């Protein structure tokens, strides 16, 4: 079940949960903080230079030590510019490094999760966890942290200077600070809620837009453009309304902050002016106080805004941690990892060769998000080299069988044996490295034909690639492409037809030279002529390999060593094609019905 967006209360805003990532850059972060403190100290002292210039050079009408004053001012300015450059560079680099680490950690963890996680969480949600949440966390541990350090220390230094210059005048200004904090917090709380709502609406609009593009063919053929368009316009109108609300609060907010700054300035001018007229304060001192009174509000606003944003960012932190701490439904035991390694650190020297014997022993199975048993007390022995075809209606349990063989899911009860040993006694990577899997809906990765085929065998030569293509009668796909193996297939193989993508998927699986081959309705998307060519290749390729073929077209499995007819998670018929046809049972009905439909289609 997809996690809900909700307010989450974590100690210290959840920051301790992400400190392990920041600790990798602790010395850089310490240096950034020190430079931020120095920069805020210098910034708070600039008005003091103006005070000295007005009181000394203007007030006393003298130019002595002016050269030293200018040199000192320029020197400090140059040092600060250099430190600011280094600080900004390091903060940016730290943000990018943290984003990279957070995204790599989350993406790598996703590779280790079972299919159940992806069934329960949509792509947009997972994408937001990897990209958006990690980006917010990286920003928090870099720019937002430096905002608090610089602005917080600047406020402290300014308040110290104000008290040192005139504690009475400082107290009059400080009286406004609690009111300013209350007003800023009041508006910020509402702005955070509105901005959170805007982000949710933006995610919905992005999702709708994506569906509008990917589902363009279905939208046009079902003539539902107006329905989809109305829904999209409703979402954008809602977002406009909420955004206008946020803009209204933003306008009130900045107007109020400006008013508070003006009140502080008025107090300083009123009281400071009286002190200056009565020769109790110099004009330069009044000038520096006015600068401080005006300048303290923006840093105060920034600190409160950052602290307020922590309430929102802690949701990002919690969701990110939920992802990286999600345990896979299918996981190798510590003992297996110790011997065979894990997904990213395999110990191939300990891998035994896979022969291909497969057996189900008293297997019960239900999906993690389901209540009903798909398989109950299921038993099956498949000697190595056997070609097993599985047929049955939708939901009968065909794909469940091969999913358990591939260990995409674990049995609820019982065992799946590979070469006589429980599949859980060896690593998932060991098993997957010996399985070739071709799906009904083929998937190609962005890149060239060569790149895609080498996912089956990274060290494959062009000769090996062409041999695999020849086995599945797919050389024509390459020959008609301008750049041959170097031709780009487009995103998801979008530049190829479904049949062409399927042929390349076959070649990729065969190139891996698997001991177990799984074809999950793999010829369902191929036209009849292509099917005949590839069927001849499959008959050749599966020799000597254990193969499981889930058949959509029963004509493709007539040569199978054994055909299993599955209904409600149980094998109701078993035998060769000729044996099952003689029985005139359920398989006979399926085959006869499909044959009659094929004849009708041919005549039509």
Residue ranges and their predicted role:
Residues 2-6, 96, 104-128, 132-136, ...:
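Short intracellular "coupling" helices and adjacent cytoplasmic loop segments at the cytosolic face
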Residues 19, 23, 27, 115-116, ...:
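An intracellular "coupling" helix at the cytosolic face of ABC transporter transmembrane type-1 domains
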Residues 340-604:
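ABC-type nucleotide-binding domain
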Residues 76-95, 142, 146-153, 174-198, ...:
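Alpha-helical transmembrane segments of multi-pass membrane proteins
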Residues 16, 27-48, 52, 69, ...:
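Alpha-helical segments in transporter systems
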Residues 1-43, 58-69, 87-91, 95, ...:
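Membrane-integrated ABC transporters
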Residues 61-68, 161-175, 245, 249-319, ...:
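Helix-loop-helix
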Residues 24, 28-41, 69, 73-79, ...:
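Transmembrane helices of ABC transporter permease
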């Amino acid at each position: 079940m997809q996690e809900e967006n909700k307010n989450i209360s974590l100690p210290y805003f959840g920051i301790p949960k992400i400190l392990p990532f920041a600790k990798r850059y602790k010395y850089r972060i310490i240096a950034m903080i020190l430079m931020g403190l120095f920069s805020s100290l210098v910034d708070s002292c600039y008005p003091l230079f103006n005070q000295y210039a007005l009181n000394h050079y203007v007030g006393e009408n003298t130019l002595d030590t002016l050269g030293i004053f200018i040199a000192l001012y320029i020197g400090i300015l140059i040092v600060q510019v250099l430190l600011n450059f280094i600080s900004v560079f390091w903060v940016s680099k730290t943000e990018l490094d943290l984003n990279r680490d957070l995204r790599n950690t989350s993406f790598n963890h996703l590779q280790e999760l079972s299919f159940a996680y992806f069934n329960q969480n949509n792509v947009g949600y997972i994408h937001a966890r990897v990209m958006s949440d990690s980006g917010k966390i990286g920003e928090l541990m870099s720019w937002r942290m430096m905002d608090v350090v610089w602005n917080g220390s600047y406020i402290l230094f300014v308040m110290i200077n104000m008290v040192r210059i005139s504690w009475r005048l400082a107290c009059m200004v400080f009286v406004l600070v609690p009111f300013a904090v209350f007003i800023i917090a009041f508006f910020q709380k509402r702005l955070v809620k509105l901005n959170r709502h805007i982000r949710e609406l933006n995610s919905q609009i992005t999702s709708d837009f994506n569906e509008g593009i990917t589902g363009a063919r279905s939208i046009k053929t079902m003539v539902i453009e107006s329905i989809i368009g109305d829904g999209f316009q409703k979402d954008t109108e809602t977002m406009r309304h909420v955004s206008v609300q946020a803009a209204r609060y933003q306008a009130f907010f900045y107007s109020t902050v400006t008013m508070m700054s003006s009140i502080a300035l008025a107090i300083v001018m009123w009281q400071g002016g009286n002190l200056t007229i009565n020769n109790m304060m110099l004009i330069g001192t009044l000038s520096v106080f006015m600068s401080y009174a005006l300048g303290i509000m923006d840093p105060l606003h920034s600190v409160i805004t950052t602290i307020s944003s922590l309430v929102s960012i802690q949701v990002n932190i919690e969701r990110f941690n939920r992802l990286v701490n999600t345990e896979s439904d299918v996981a190798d035991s510590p003992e297996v990892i110790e011997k065979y390694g894990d997904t990213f650190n395999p110990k191939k020297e300990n891998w035994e060769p896979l022969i291909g014997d497969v057996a189900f022993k008293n297997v019960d199975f239900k999906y993690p998000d389901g209540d009903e048993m798909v398989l109950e007390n299921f038993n099956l022995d498949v000697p190595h080299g056997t070609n097993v075809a599985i047929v049955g209606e939708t939901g009968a349990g065909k794909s469940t069988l091969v999913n358990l063989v591939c260990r995409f899911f674990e049995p609820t009860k019982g065992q799946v044996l590979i070469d006589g040993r429980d599949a859980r006694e060896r690593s998932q990577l060991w098993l997957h490295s010996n399985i070739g899997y071709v799906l009904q809906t083929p998937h190609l990765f962005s890149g060239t034909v060569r790149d895609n085929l080498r996912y089956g065998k990274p060290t494959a030569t062009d000769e090996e690639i062409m041999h695999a293509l020849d086995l599945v009668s797919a050389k024509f796909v390459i020959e008609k492409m301008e750049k041959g193996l170097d031709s780009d297939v487009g995103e998801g193989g979008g530049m190829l037809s479904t049949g062409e993508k399927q042929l390349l998927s076959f070649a990729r699986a065969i190139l891996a030279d698997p001991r177990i081959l799984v074809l999950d309705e793999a010829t369902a998307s191929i036209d009849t002529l292509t099917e005949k060519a590839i069927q001849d290749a499959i008959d050749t390729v599966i020799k000597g390999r254990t193969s499981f073929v889930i058949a959509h077209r029963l004509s493709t499995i007539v040569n199978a060593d054994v055909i299993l007819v599955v209904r409600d998670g149980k094998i109701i018929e078993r035998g060769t094609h000729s044996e099952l046809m003689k029985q005139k049972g359920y398989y006979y009905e399926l085959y006869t019905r499909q044959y009659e439909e094929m004849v009708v289609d041919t005549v039509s």
